[in-house]
A protein has these predicted regions:
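N-terminal cap/lid segment of alpha/beta-hydrolase-fold proteins
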Residues: 30-66
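Catalytic active-site module of serine/aspartate enzymes centered on a nucleophile-bearing elbow/loop
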Residues: 292-313
């Protein structure tokens, strides 16, 4: 074998070595990615936080091996359709789990079985539930972050803009809790349902998104009523000075929820004296291959605005 190897031309030997080195590098990289995407956790699926139309509203709780005492809620929603217990892939939130964050996968009833407005109400209850049981999950009730993409980003911003105190005299103790969140990191949200701009979902008359009309209920077909619904369900109309730190990653080639949806929100926030950080992905459409790397950046954002913030009191 050695004689054969020596007999080969030098350029062939170099080529073989280069190929072997490349294959080894690919193998090691794949092994690392597999290890990184599968952290050691304790997972509880299907914790019921409420009901809607006779159906359970559920949260999955993913606790890392070394929790840092801070929770991040993931809005499991795309097109305002949600999954059920176990639907959130661990690999997608691996950077958060490896950062020590306890992850709460908040699911809602998918439209059109429930309306988008119902989903907004229900994810608010989800945050109240998490806060009420903070001690059970080993997290600080005053340091809860939220993340999601697309419809999940929209729901996250509704929490950022409208989440707030519960009802002090509510019979259900969960409803007495606040639904406010303390930091937000999201992907490509829709922020203005009354102005869909250059979106492929724009009907051209100020009406609801073309593919999601049923998701807003029968009143969405009545323009005067839709204007009330659309305004109430759009984060941009609820921007206020008390919003938490917000990070948005958005692609400049997104035709479903164009980048302008985020920049408009940023401009409105600036008018209120609030900074919203946008990271533009050149050529990025409604999702891209390196989103796991962006989740790692989200974890660093939460480090700055949640983990490294001293607990209240």
């Amino acid at each position: 074998m050695r004689r054969f190897w020596r007999w080969l031309p030098r350029w062939v030997r170099r080529l073989v070595k280069a190929i072997l080195a490349l294959l080894l590098g690919i193998l090691l990289s794949a092994a690392f990615l597999y290890w990184y995407a599968n952290p050691s956790i304790t997972r509880i699926n299907g914790v019921v936080y409420g009901t809607r139309g006779g159906k359970d509203l559920t949260i999955d709780v993913l606790t890392p091996k070394r929790p840092n005492g801070v929770g991040v809620a993931v809005m499991v929603s795309g097109g305002w359709k949600s999954g059920g217990p176990g639907s959130l892939d661990t690999w997608f939130v691996a950077p958060l789990l490896r950062g020590g964050y306890t992850v709460f996968a908040v699911c809602h009833i998918s439209q059109p079985q429930a309306t988008v407005m119902d989903a907004i109400t229900d994810v608010n209850r989800g945050i109240r539930f998490i806060r009420h049981h903070a001690a059970d999950y080993g997290i600080d009730p005053d340091r809860i972050g939220v993340t999601g993409g697309s419809a999940g980003g929209h729901l996250s911003l509704m929490l950022a803009t409208r989440g707030g105190p519960g009802l002090a005299d509510a019979a259900d103790p969960i409803d007495r809790e606040s639904s406010a969140v303390q930091a937000v990191a999201i992907f490509f949200p829709v922020t203005d349902l009354l102005n869909l701009g250059t979106s492929t979902e724009n009907p051209g008359d100020g009406g609801p998104p073309i593919s999601f009309v049923k998701g807003f209920g029968p009143d969405a077909l009545d323009m005067p009523k839709w204007k009330v619904i659309g305004r109430a369900s759009s984060p941009i109309y609820h921007v206020n000075p008390d919003m938490p730190p917000i990070l948005i990653h958005h692609g400049d080639a997104d035709t479903l929820t164009p980048l302008e949806q985020s920049t408009w929100f940023q401009e409105r926030a600036k008018e209120q004296g609030v900074d919203v950080t946008i990271r533009v992905h050149p050529g990025g459409e409604h999702g891209w291959l390196t989103m796991l790397w962006d989740i790692w950046k989200f974890a660093r954002w939460f480090d700055t605005h949640l983990k490294d913030v001293p607990p209240a009191g």
